């Protein structure tokens, strides 16, 4: 789910127009509920270091920091940053996007990388059965020198695990820069620009979706919320392979998260244009 300015995350506004408070540029998403890590811990500089924030100078002040976070994503090659289509489809083609892998977007003097371009799956927004919710941000060749890149899954990876009964008790890492949320009472969404990780339990596997539980009260674990869209999902048994990316969830971030699978023919057809597939 895409980020909305945290100061505007009052419950009424959230339910009425989850992603509509950005004004420069405008970009209501077709799937619209935004998403962020909650029930988690800061990753620090070394853990999940190749998970980054997608940024745009929304306030046009020339300073790129936590106020400019749009979504989360992950580095899948030295020059390719993977995120969600609904994070970028509203931008003009010449929009200057940025990526930062800083663990705290409000830290002084964070490094930001000016993207050289971006594109998203042309099927996005045209197929309600399969959202094609993928985008890639292109980075300069030497900008990520020395950084590790994440792997993509083999074809049918999650199906194979399901067939073996290996998913029912599986847990997954959520990693992102999004907001937290209050577990009970009136919804609240604190945001601090810090990259965090949490763990969620498996819920269901669909042809294009991985669903995870994020009911903290019931499971004692965490989830994601506003600002985590495009962020990676890893099996806790393999934190190097991005098996899905965040697309959406319930508006108050207390039930389930719905994540777009990367092991399907649709995902592989798009991503295979930009990176070598396993």
Describe the residue ranges of each PLM region.
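Chymotrypsin/trypsin-fold serine protease catalytic domain
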Residues: 25, 130-221, 257-258, 264-272
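Generic short beta-strand segments
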Residues: 53-59, 176-180, 248
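Solvent-exposed loop/turn segments at secondary-structure junctions
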Residues: 80-81, 87-89, 125, 142-145, ...
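Conserved catalytic-core segment of clan PA serine endopeptidases
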Residues: 33-46, 65, 93-161
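Bacterial N-terminal signal peptides that target proteins for export
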Residues: 1-8
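A conserved glycine-rich beta-strand in the N-terminal activation segment of trypsin-fold
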Residues: 51-53, 59-78
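C-terminal motif of bacterial Sec signal peptides marking the signal peptidase cleavage site
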Residues: 15-18
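C-terminal subregion of chymotrypsin/trypsin-like serine protease catalytic domains
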Residues: 20-36, 44, 70-89, 95-101, ...
């Amino acid at each position: 789910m895409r980020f909305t300015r945290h100061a505007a995350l009052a419950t009424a506004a959230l339910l009425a127009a989850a992603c509509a408070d950005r004004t420069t540029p405008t970009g209501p998403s077709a799937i619209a509920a935004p998403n962020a890590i909650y029930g988690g811990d800061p990753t620090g500089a070394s853990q999940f270091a190749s998970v980054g924030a997608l940024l745009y100078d929304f306030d046009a002040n020339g300073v790129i920091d936590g106020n400019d976070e749009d979504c989360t994503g992950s580095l899948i090659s030295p020059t390719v940053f993977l995120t969600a289509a609904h994070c970028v489809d509203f931008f003009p083609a010449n929009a200057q996007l940025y990526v930062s892998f800083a663990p705290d977007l409000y830290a002084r003097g964070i490094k930001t990388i000016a993207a050289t371009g971006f594109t998203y799956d042309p099927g996005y927004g045209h197929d309600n059965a399969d959202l094609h919710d993928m985008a890639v941000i292109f980075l300069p060749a030497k900008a990520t020198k020395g950084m590790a890149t994440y792997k993509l899954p083999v074809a049918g990876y999650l199906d194979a695990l399901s067939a073996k009964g290996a998913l029912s008790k599986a847990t997954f890492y959520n990693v992102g820069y999004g907001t937290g949320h209050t577990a009970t009472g009136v919804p609240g969404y604190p945001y601090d620009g810090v990259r965090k990780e949490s763990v969620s339990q498996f819920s269901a596997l669909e042809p294009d979706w991985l669903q995870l539980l994020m009911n903290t009260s019931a499971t004692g674990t965490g989830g994601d919320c506003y600002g985590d869209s495009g962020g990676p999902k890893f099996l806790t048994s393999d934190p190097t392979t991005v098996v899905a990316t965040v697309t959406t969830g319930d508006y108050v971030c207390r039930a389930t998260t719905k994540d777009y699978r990367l092991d399907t023919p649709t995902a592989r057809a798009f991503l295979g244009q930009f990176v070598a597939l396993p």
